[in-house]
């Protein structure tokens, strides 16, 4: 059974979906989402100039009310040798790489919903209850997400520990709309901040099966 959602809980971040052709060219039709991801990632990284390990922020979450930690699953990209699942998630304007840990995130999810995490969840909205933000080594980023190294750019990844389905319907849009979603890594401020990092955190090198 999926969790029921009251109308009052949707109002703060509800954006009505309509036919793409009826929207202005730069208006991306998203539901129940806000644009907050890139600002929170940059804020978290900027709060500490040096890192002795890969962890950027424990218990990463939106800090501006009434934004809720709701993201859309765009795609699953790989499974690691530890049975973690890598994916791309998005708010209303930006995308980020994510990794769902097998334990506790995937185990708890599959025990709750009685089906595999990847079953009919692509393009669904999820509410993340607990997650960390951490840097991932470039070789793992290439293996698990297919992104080539951008020089010295450090890649921040969302490590999901606890989540559930927020809205079970699957929402995807034509390519011209989906392509308007930008990676947080392509943001100018992110590049200025993470492209010149002098720290060398210890990374965990993961093996991924595409």
UniProtKB/Swiss-Prot annotation:
InterPro entries: TPP1/Est3 (IPR019437). GO terms for cellular component: chromosome, telomeric region; telomerase holoenzyme complex. It is found in: Nucleus; Chromosome, Telomere. GO terms for molecular function: telomeric DNA binding. It comes from the Eukaryota. Keywords: Chromosome, Nucleus, Telomere. Pfam families: TPP1 (PF10341). Its main location: nucleus. The keyword Chloroplast does not apply. GO terms for biological process: telomere formation via telomerase; telomere maintenance via telomerase. Component of the telomerase complex. Belongs to the EST3 family. Component of the telomerase complex involved in telomere replication. Stimulates RNA/DNA heteroduplex unwinding which favors the telomere replication by the telomerase. This is Telomere replication protein EST3. It comes from Candida albicans (strain SC5314 / ATCC MYA-2876) (Yeast). The gene is EST3.
């Amino acid at each position: 059974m999926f969790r029921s959602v009251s109308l009052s809980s949707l109002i703060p971040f509800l954006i009505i979906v309509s036919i793409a052709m009826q929207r202005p060219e730069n208006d991306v039709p998203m539901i129940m989402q806000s644009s907050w991801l890139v600002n929170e990632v940059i804020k978290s990284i900027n709060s500490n100039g040096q890192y002795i390990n890969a962890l950027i922020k424990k218990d990463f979450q939106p800090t501006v009310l009434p934004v809720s930690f709701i993201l859309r699953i765009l795609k699953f990209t790989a499974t690691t040798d530890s049975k973690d699942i890598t994916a791309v998630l998005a708010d209303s304007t930006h995308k980020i790489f994510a990794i769902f840990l097998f334990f506790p995130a995937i185990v708890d999810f599959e025990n709750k919903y009685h089906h595999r995490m990847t079953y009919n969840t692509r393009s669904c909205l999820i509410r993340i209850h607990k997650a960390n933000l951490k840097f991932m080594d470039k070789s793992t980023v290439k293996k698990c997400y297919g992104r080539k190294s951008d020089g010295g750019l450090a890649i921040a990844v969302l490590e999901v520990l606890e989540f559930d389905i927020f809205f079970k319907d699957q929402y995807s849009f034509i390519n011209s709309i989906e392509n308007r979603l930008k990676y947080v890594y392509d943001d100018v401020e992110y590049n200025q901040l993470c492209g010149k990092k002098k720290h060398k955190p210890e990374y965990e090198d993961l093996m991924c099966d595409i």
